[in-house]
A protein has these predicted regions:
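A structural boundary/capping signal
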Residues: 1-187
Length: 187
């Protein structure tokens, strides 16, 4: 990891070495293509630390963001880690997402490896422009799940601090949803 000097090098390293999946409490690695990937997630998921992620070569966006956090902070960047979800009073199947943004010169950059459809470093002139762009990407994805108009108003975006290692999916979601809500222009 010490030989990775730039965000671009980090993205290349991660895209070549980290697969989308997660480590279960039972020690099993769940790959995205596994038949029980989604059904076991809430019951089995634990947040990996960076060493485990490197050894297992699997992590979801939660795990990958913590790996990214470690690298960016070690290399002196100003960062924020952001979470988005549809927060309803009932269980729902809508996907959530965590991602990292960082300041580079006069730009805000969205660093994305876990979401292979949006993989890359996306540069924006303002923080608000970045948040609005990502919100619309998330909304576009949610429409594939036939999200209802009234549920769209329940999308929250939070900025969160580093969670504890090895917490469950439930504990992670509690941590990030109880973090600071970011208000921004979603148009």
């Amino acid at each position: 990891m010490n030989d990775i000097k730039t965000p671009e090098e980090l993205l290349t390293f991660m895209s070549q070495n980290i697969n989308y999946g997660y480590l279960g409490k039972n020690g099993k690695i769940y790959h995205y293509a596994d038949f029980d990937f989604n059904t076991k997630w809430y019951e089995q998921y634990i947040l990996e630390n960076s060493e485990e992620l490197l050894n297992n070569k699997y992590g979801n966006c939660f795990d990958q963001v913590e790996f990214e956090r470690e690298w960016f902070l070690k290399n002196g960047y100003k960062i924020e880690t952001i979470y988005e979800m549809v927060k309803l009073e009932y269980n729902n199947e809508y996907p959530t997402h965590a991602f990292l943004v960082y300041k580079d010169d006069n730009y805000w950059c969205w660093f994305e490896n876990a979401d292979s459809n949006n993989r890359g470093i996306h540069r924006f002139t303002t923080y608000e422009e970045l948040l609005s762009y990502q919100y619309h990407k998330y909304l576009e994805y949610l429409k594939k799940y036939n999200i209802k108009a009234e549920e769209i108003t329940k999308i929250i975006t939070t900025v969160f601090e580093k969670p504890k290692e090895h917490i469950s999916a439930e504990e992670y979601i509690e941590h990030v949803t109880n973090s600071k809500i970011i208000n921004f222009n979603k148009k």
